[in-house]
Amino acid sequence: MLPPHRRIGVRFANGGKALKRIDLNVDIGEGFPFDRELLKFATSANIGLGEHAGSRELTTETVAYCREAGLRVGAHPGYPHRASMGRDPIPEGEHKVYFDSIFVQCQWFAAMYAPDYLKPHGGFYNDTAVVLPEGWRTENDAPTPYGQEGIFLSKHPGVQFLMMLLRVYKLPLMGLDRTSHAEVARRAGKGFIKEGFADRLYRDNGTLMPRDRPGAVIKDPDRVAEQVRRLAPKVDSICLHGDGPDCLQFAERVRKTLEDAGYEVGA
C-alpha cells in the first residue's frame, strides 16, 4: 500500500475547499545519472524494463529504491532499439519482433514487481497515441473487422496490442488524453491516468511534436512553468524527463510551480 502522503485523493483546506492533487511522473531506470535525485520531486516512477535502455539488473535496483521512497511504480516498456533509445517507429515488417519483446518485458516485470500502472515508452507511446477518427463509437463491444474501428486498428496495430497488454496484466494506462490511449484504457476497464508533458511541444491535434522537429523539446524553464500551469487543470499527472542536463532544475521548477498555484503534489 502507498504511504498516506502518496495515496490518490484530495485534501481539504481553507474552510473545506478541495485542492486538486497532481502526480509528477519521471522516466527512470534507463542509465542516466540523476535518477535518485529526481525522486525528491517525483511521486510516480516509470521504470524502464531493460530493452530500450538500461538492463534488468538496473530495473531491479530502481524498483527497490522507488518502493523504499514510497513512489507509485509504473511499467515503462519500450521498443528494443537501443540506437534510438526506443524512440524510432517500428521498421517495416518488424512488428511481431517488437511486440514479442514488449510482451516479454511486461510479463517479467508484472510477475516480479506488481506495477501500479503501465506507460509506454518513446516510439511505443507515440505509435499508440493516435487521434481517433471522427464519429468513433464508444461502446464496449469488440470492433467489427470491416467497421470503422476495425479499419482503424488494422492501420495502427500497436493500439490493439496495447489494449491486449492492459487486459492481460489488468493495469491502468498512463497516457495522452483525446487519443486512442483514452479509448483503449476505457475498453480495458482498469483506469486511465491523463498525462501532460512539462517539456514537450504539442501539435495542434493534441499529440506530441516528434523529437526531431525544431523546438520539440522545451529548454526554457519559464516556458516549462507556463506549460505546467496551462496543463495542470486538464491532467492527472505531469511528466518530468530525466535524460537532460537541466532535469533537476526543471523538476524543482515544475514542482514549485504546481505548489505555488495551490495544487497538492502526490500520486
Q: What is the meaning of each model-derived region?
A:
Residues 247-265:
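C-terminal helical cap(s) of enzyme catalytic domains, especially alpha/beta-barrels
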